[in-house]
């Protein structure tokens, strides 16, 4: 049974909200709702690579499942298939040819999901939850990189049950990103390590964190020649750091900016500060999106150091985001992120994934 020819439906007979005209604040930006969204908090989103015709969206959730939708040009979404872990799914990624999806879970494993056969097999094992999973495609090797709370970074040939390589981390892996030939891993206790992936993965540099609070998300950015040149790092303290690996002028080129905070500025109106839950760079313009526990997304131009847009406030945190391969679609997930503890969790509240046309809003403004 081929995934791309069928609709095996976790959404069959579903309750589509597509085209809904409700005016409540779960969708204040009036974006397109993905049908049959997960039944628990959505921790990760990833769009298919440009090698696949069309657009397919993957989401992993705290309901232990991974779901795949086809996103049509009209914005309509068709549920295609799903797979299960035995614990919450914390990260997802695609192989470069779009035939496989890799999933990382609290069940201490990572799996490889073959979308054409709709079969999933375990390819990685850790001693604690697996927080990150990335596909690495190098000229001389291909592998899956997993980062775990067991304080290791492991590299796997999907044909073998033993890792090709294990690198020790200073602390638990909290977030990571890969754009060949660079990987960056951020850990607990504000650890930050850059790896080079040419020939074989190796540690390139440990960096003193530019942020004073817990790392939450990281995304690599490219230069004008399309080479990875630095990263954006987000923390729980409503702040993002832009960090270049080899900047001409470190003191000037590297900077941090505040985001996902309420408008209060002084003691009479104290400011509420929220976690930055996700960062994604636009694949064409190099501008970036951030999403936060405040229930807003914002678009930024890091080169001009300006904010391009901030959304209205949703009635739940935004827990994850991503762009499709050509940057026309911005996907973001609205669900509880546990930032206020279990007492604020409402199991009756629905989780949503929204799709927004992002082609124009992410363009850098013309310099005057």
Swiss-Prot record:
GO terms for biological process: cell division; regulation of mitotic spindle organization; RNA export from nucleus; transcription-dependent tethering of RNA polymerase II gene DNA at nuclear periphery. It comes from the Eukaryota. GO terms for molecular function: RNA binding; ubiquitin binding. GO terms for cellular component: cytoplasm; fibrillar center; mitotic spindle pole; nuclear pore; nucleoplasm. Its main location: cytoplasm. WD repeats lie at residues 37-79, 84-114, 125-157, 168-206, 215-255, 271-301, 310-346. The modification Phosphothreonine is found at residue 229. Residues 15-34 are annotated as: Disordered. Gene3D superfamilies: YVTN repeat-like/Quinoprotein amine dehydrogenase (2.130.10.10). It is found in: Cytoplasm; Nucleus; Cytoplasm, Cytoskeleton, Spindle pole. The keyword Transport applies. Keywords: Cell cycle, Cell division, Cytoplasm, Cytoskeleton, Mitosis, Nucleus, Phosphoprotein, Repeat, Transport, WD repeat. InterPro entries: G-protein_beta_WD-40_rep, WD40/YVTN_repeat-like_dom_sf, WD40_repeat_CS, WD40_repeat_dom_sf, WD40_rpt. Belongs to the WD repeat rae1 family. Interacts with NUMA1 (via N-terminal end of the coiled-coil domain); this interaction promotes spindle formation in mitosis. Interacts with NUP98. Interacts with MYCBP2. Interacts with USP11. Plays a role in mitotic bipolar spindle formation. Binds mRNA. May function in nucleocytoplasmic transport and in directly or indirectly attaching cytoplasmic mRNPs to the cytoskeleton. This is mRNA export factor. The lineage of its organism: Eukaryota, Metazoa, Chordata, Craniata, Vertebrata.
């Amino acid at each position: 049974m081929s995934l791309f020819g069928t609709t095996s439906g976790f959404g069959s007979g579903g309750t589509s909200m597509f085209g809904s005209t409700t005016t409540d604040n779960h969708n204040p930006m009036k974006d397109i709702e993905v049908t049959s969204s997960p039944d628990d908090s959505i921790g990760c989103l990833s769009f298919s690579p440009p090698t696949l015709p069309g657009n397919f969206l993957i989401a992993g959730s705290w309901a232990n499942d991974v779901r795949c939708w086809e996103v049509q040009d009209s914005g309509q979404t068709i549920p295609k298939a799903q797979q299960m872990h035995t614990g919450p799914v914390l990260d997802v990624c695609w192989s470069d040819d779009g035939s496989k999806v890799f999933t990382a879970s609290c069940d201490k494993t990572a799996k490889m999901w073959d979308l054409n056969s709709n079969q999933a097999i375990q390819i990685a094992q850790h001693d604690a939850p697996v927080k990150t999973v990335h596909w690495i495609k190098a000229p001389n090797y291909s592998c899956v990189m997993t980062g775990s709370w067991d304080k290791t970074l492991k590299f796997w040939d999907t044909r073998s049950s033993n890792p090709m390589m294990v690198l020790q981390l200073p602390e638990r892996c909290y977030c990571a990103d890969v754009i060949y030939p660079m990987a960056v891993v951020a850990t607990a206790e504000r650890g930050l390590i850059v790896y080079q992936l040419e020939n074989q993965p190796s540690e390139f540099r440990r960096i003193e964190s530019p942020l004073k609070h817990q790392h939450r998300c990281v995304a690599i950015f490219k230069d004008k020649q399309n080479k990875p040149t630095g990263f954006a790092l987000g923390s729980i303290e409503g702040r993002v750091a832009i960090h270049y690996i080899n900047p001409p002028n470190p003191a000037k080129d590297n900077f941090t900016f505040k985001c996902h905070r309420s408008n209060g500025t002084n003691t009479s109106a104290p400011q509420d500060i929220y976690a930055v839950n996700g960062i994604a760079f636009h694949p064409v313009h190099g501008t970036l999106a951030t999403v936060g526990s405040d229930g807003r997304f914002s678009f930024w131009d890091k080169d001009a150091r300006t904010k391009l847009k901030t959304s209205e406030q949703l009635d739940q945190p935004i827990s994850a985001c991503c762009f499709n391969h050509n940057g026309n679609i911005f996907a973001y997930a609205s669900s509880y992120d546990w930032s206020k503890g279990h007492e604020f969790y409402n199991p009756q509240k629905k989780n949503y994934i929204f799709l927004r046309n992002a082609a124009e809003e992410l363009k850098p403004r013309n310099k005057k």
